[in-house]
């Protein structure tokens, strides 16, 4: 019987799938290091955000496969798993719909002042509608920074709101961008024309602090920046300073650096920020599908039917 370790809360659908196939599936907490004492007995791992480093791998004497509960894998030390020839599988295009919807929700929340209006109605201030103006999305200019799976869906949704959609992706030739959108050749030019900027950039060390003081100072003082991608794309100190100085500038953040944010993080105290707890993909439907993808990656691997399109480190088989 193959033994599967699950670290972090995972939807029951995939776990039931594995148990029905006679796998032993153990769910352990990663809130402390006690799970490390048992690592040596498991053949497979389903992991969310737990750090899988050299210590982890060296303790996992029988580990044959890692199934990442997500698309990114910056919590996994690729070098050590390559050295041990342990395959790492991701889930593929499962979360693009909920994350793109969440992006639009943050944009709407900011434009329509939902959080502020809600708080004022609860304070019996119904007349706030006469003094505090929200905005239409129609005809507003939005820059989608990164045109991958999620960026494409966000672009389509923005079109439904009759927004002017601009696309920038340095890894994509301009002719790959549909003519229904406007391609941006140089990200440093004309940044001040945008009402919204939303980030959809995959993990890459070169992208760290991509949005810094220099970038922010080129934006309109009434722009809003949305990040449902990666916390480290934005220099939080620079963003904090910019938000404090420009009260009409807004941010919608689902991701932080580090996570969770410290309770003393000043972003949590600002009115011109909308915050969610890295929950964009955490819908019932998406979590069930993510769990099933992890389970199938494991069962397919042990049945010699692995889906190499979901395999991160293909070189271990070359």
Q: Predicted segments — roles?
A:
Residues 151-152:
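N-terminal Rossmann-fold NAD(P) dinucleotide-binding loop
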Residues 51-57, 171-266:
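Rossmann-like adenosine-cofactor binding region
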Residues 88, 222-318:
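Rossmann-like dinucleotide-binding domain for NAD(H)/NADP(H)
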Residues 1-42, 162-166, 302, 317-318:
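N-terminal glycine-/charge-rich "phosphate-binding" loop or analogous flexible N-terminal tail
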Residues 86, 92-141, 156, 160, ...:
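Phosphate-binding beta-alpha-beta segment of Rossmann-like dinucleotide-binding domains, i.e.
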Residues 44-118:
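Phosphate/diphosphate ligand-binding glycine-rich loop within oxidoreductases
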Residues 147-148:
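Glycine-rich Rossmann-fold phosphate-binding loop(s) that bind the pyrophosphate
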Residues 43-44, 65, 196, 224, ...:
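Short, Asp-centered acidic motifs that coordinate Mg2+ and/or phosphate
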């Amino acid at each position: 019987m193959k033994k599967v370790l699950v670290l972090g809360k995972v939807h029951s659908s995939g776990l039931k799938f594995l148990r029905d196939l006679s796998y032993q599936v153990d769910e352990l907490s990663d809130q402390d290091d006690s799970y490390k004492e048992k690592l040596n007995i498991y053949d497979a791992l389903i992991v969310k955000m737990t750090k899988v480093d050299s210590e982890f791998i060296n303790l996992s004497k029988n580990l044959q496969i890692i199934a990442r509960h997500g698309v990114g894998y910056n919590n996994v030390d690729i070098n050590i798993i390559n050295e041990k020839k342990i395959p790492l599988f991701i889930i593929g295009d499962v979360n693009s719909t909920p994350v793109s919807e969440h992006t639009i929700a943050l944009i709407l929340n900011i434009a329509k002042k939902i959080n502020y209006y809600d708080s004022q109605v609860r304070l019996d201030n119904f007349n706030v509608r006469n003094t505090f103006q929200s905005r239409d999305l129609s005809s507003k200019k939005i820059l989608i920074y990164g045109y991958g799976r999620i960026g494409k869906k966000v672009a389509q949704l923005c079109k439904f709101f009759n927004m002017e959609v601009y696309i920038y992706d340095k890894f994509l030739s301009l002719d790959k961008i549909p003519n229904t959108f406007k391609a941006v050749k140089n990200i440093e030019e004309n940044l001040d024309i945008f009402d919204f900027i939303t980030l959809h950039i995959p993990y890459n060390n070169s992208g760290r602090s991509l949005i810094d003081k220099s970038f922010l100072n080129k934006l309109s003082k009434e722009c809003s920046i949305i990040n449902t991608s990666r916390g480290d794309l934005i220099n939080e100190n620079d963003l904090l300073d910019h938000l404090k100085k420009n009260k009409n500038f807004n941010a919608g953040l689902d991701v932080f650096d580090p996570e969770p944010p410290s309770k003393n993080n000043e972003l949590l105290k600002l009115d011109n920020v909308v915050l969610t707890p890295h929950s964009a993909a955490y819908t019932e439907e998406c979590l069930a599908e993510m769990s099933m993808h992890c389970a199938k990656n494991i069962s397919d691997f042990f049945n010699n039917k692995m889906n190499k399109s979901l395999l991160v480190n293909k070189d271990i088989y070359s």
